Amino acid sequence: MGFHHVALAAADMEATHIFYTEAMGFELVKAVVAPTPDGGWAKHLFYDTGGSKGLIAFWELHDDALPPVRGGISTAVGFPEWVNHLAFDPIDAEHYEMCKKRWLDLGADVVEIDHGFCTSIYAVDPDGTLVEWCLDTRTLDEQDRAHAASALFDPAPALEDPPVPDFHLADPSVTPPWKR
């Protein structure tokens, strides 16, 4: 069973829309505009991620009873951006490379990491949420499951070597469209 959608509040819906349509290639497919419980109103905007079933949605909130949106899903609660993040599944290796090129062409710096079982590229959305394209490079097997089960409740598990990031810097003369 998958998920239907993940919903996040956006501080700047225009910048968020530009990022998720132009940089991610997602399509806006549904909007629900309704009152909020405390007398304001909100737009709930749904984007098709282009993969299997599963949407991402953003709230544009117009309600003085609610606090302003502050930071990404990780930094807003005091964690570094790498802790809470969004990871999307590219169609294949060609799509993964196309996503990396698109981010760089649009002016976004990209971090790439080979995790051993998957390879990932990372960029940051307008609210400061880390966004990832994660390409599986091998099938998880019984050895992976056994390791996960033993690590789950081990108070002092053996540490693995940290992955080495590869930094792809965008042309500094290009301003990402969601930052204009």
Which residue stretches match the model-derived regions?
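Histidine- and/or cysteine-centered catalytic micro-motif in compact active-site loops
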Residues: 61-63, 91
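A compositional/structural signature marking long, glycine- and acidic/polar-rich segments
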Residues: 63-64, 78
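A broadly used, surface-exposed interaction patch
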Residues: 58, 65-70
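Short, acidic Gly/Pro/Ser/Thr-rich loop/turn segments
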Residues: 54, 65-66, 138-140
